[in-house]
Amino acid sequence: MRIAILWTELSGYLNACLKELAGRPGVELFVGHQVSSQDAPFALSQFEWIENRLMWRDQRSLRGIATRLKEFNPDVLVFSGWHVRGYRDAARAFKGKAWRVMTMDNCWLGTLKQMLAVIAAPAFPRPLADAVWVSGERQAVFARKLRFEQRVILNGLYSCDSSAFHAARLERIADGNTRELKFLFVGRLAREKGIRVLAQAYSAYRARVSAPWPLICCGTGSMETVLDGQPGIEMTGFIQPSELPRLMSSAACLVLPSDFEPWAVVVHEAACAGLPVLASNRVGSAIHLVQPGYNGYLFDSQDTEGLAGLMQAMTEMSEPNWRKMSDASFQLSHQYSTERWADILLEGYSMAMSADSSSR
């Protein structure tokens, strides 16, 4: 089976999923993707195993993809959204020739732009794809509004490198399963990630407790100066995927105060590593991976005092209660895995082919 994956920027977690897919019997991959951005400078060496690959920087450098796809002749064409013209053209070109799957992580927010997309859906983007692959239920709501029937909606678009983070958790358990007294933030240091709220909440939290935990901040971006130099905050810069499991295992809680976050794979990474999670109500993956009082807590994205209070509660939590939350996160993490990611795509294709045969 020949599968073409047309993505935006590759990441460590997608790399793990692609390796799982490529390892399945009879699967041959072609991957088209945009070069990495400065805010997420993933080492290109980790993707060198992909033999059939096309990297592009802009629409001009994407022109060669039509020829490459024609030569590859995919049975399955997975493409990222409808915003890349070259991918839209490819989807149209392979109508009736390949099973076309559009990926989507946009939550339904009811914005004017989304409402216009719903009105236009029968003409665009619905005809571009035979199925849509969404990250979760908030995205499935949008997909249904775009005229995708439930039978052609695939879930579980994203998974972290689940085995690597599970292994980090096991290492911590082998060392006594004690929590490292640190908060952890992982993400781009950008306005939509709630960086200012994070800085203010952490400062308020430090004023409330006698022995505050440090806050480890991993990432780069335009708002680095908001955090850098603040008491108790340690800046690491961008962390490569191979280093992140170890970092997760050396913290006690993930904090994610995003103001705009369609999904956030880092929540799955934290859950796999057995970390409780404090996430804003704008984090798309939280609806599936954070159960308030069970493995973490939710807060309004602009509620600085609310976040400070939750950080205080986490600091004052007993070790046995922290372990319960840690175990709960691990249990919730099993909703997604690299194995399941590959299964979803291959099972979806099999069902689509069976339905097509039955209709003839």
Model regions and ranges:
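Conserved donor-binding/catalytic core segment of Leloir-type glycosyltransferases
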Residues: 174-193, 199-203
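Conserved acidic donor-binding segment of nucleotide-sugar-dependent glycosyltransferases
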Residues: 237-238, 292-293, 297-304, 312-319
